[in-house]
Amino acid sequence: MPGIVELPTLEELKVDEVKISSAVLKAAAHHYGAQCDKPNKEFMLCRWEEKDPRRCLEEGKLVNKCALDFFRQIKRHCAEPFTEYWTCIDYTGQQLFRHCRKQQAKFDECVLDKMGWVRPDLGELSKVTKVKTDRPLPENPYHSRPRPDPSPEIEGDLKPAIHGSRFYFWTK
């Protein structure tokens, strides 16, 4: 029926949460962006095309899974330098990177040595990229309404306006 909204079940919505603070997210942002680029862009493309978050639950679960795997790898291989780095960011008043360059260098070195991840250059993750996806294109990606007939038939005779043109207020 057109007026009934189908809501997902609780089992469909159940995922493990990424329970971390903003300082941890900020410290890991560059490497996370490089490692989880594809699932994040797939999810954002789905959200933009579908305009309905219920249709993008699977893509959202993949984003969450990638984030959890990413932070587990960081914890397993580079926990100490990463903790020093995000703690430094957390203790600076405005969470600025410039006060923590030494800790950042240690963390980047650890990530490069143990996992082979290179910190992306500034602006590399914000470049426009094409997303290759296996999802089918939505039937109506812009959610536009059907266009009306350009020149509808006018029914009956049209009479001139009673007071003439309404263009000027002083016309009768």
UniProtKB/Swiss-Prot annotation:
GO MF term set = protein-containing complex binding
Composition bias (Basic and acidic residues) maps to 146-159
Motif Cx9C motif 3, which positions?
78-88
**Extent of motif Cx9C motif 4:** 100-110
Main localization is: mitochondrion
Motif Cx9C motif 2 per record, residues: 56-66
Q: What is this protein called?
A: NADH dehydrogenase [ubiquinone] 1 alpha subcomplex subunit 8
Q: Which organism is it from?
A: Pongo abelii (Sumatran orangutan)
